[in-house]
């Protein structure tokens, strides 16, 4: 976490070197499905998450993003510590140059039967069986979380 130590403004999305983001890897109660979004701008299937908006509570930021991006009300943390960390490049777009996201990820659980609400940030939102995720994405950071999910004890 040299990036955090070396950048007091690490939460600021205007920090062009990159910034912290918070993500929610949301699984169902059976630990058999994950909720993924087809990201509107990036065009790939990924976990819910986004900018922390100057909120130093990374778990709280990921939790907020999970609720905002899915419409789910009853999203619960499974672990009280970080589930995964990933650093990835966000391509340049008309509003900002290419930059890095230092993504801090937490594990959450939600009811797969609860209604979902798609936001403008998403082309689609779906519960996908863990063993079928490779059919829609080759993103290693997503596949790594699938592998980690298998190691989390069932309820």
Feature locations, PLM:
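Acidic, metal-coordinating catalytic segment for phosphate/diphosphate chemistry
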Residues: 1-23
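Short histidine-centered beta-strand/loop micro-motifs
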Residues: 13-15, 35-37, 50, 116-119
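Histidine-centered active-site/metal-ligand motif
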Residues: 19, 39, 51, 99-101
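Glycine-rich active-site/cofactor-binding loop and its immediate structural neighborhood
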Residues: 25-29, 34-63
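Charged phosphate-binding loop/patch that engages nucleotide di/tri-phosphates or the phosphate backbone
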Residues: 137-155
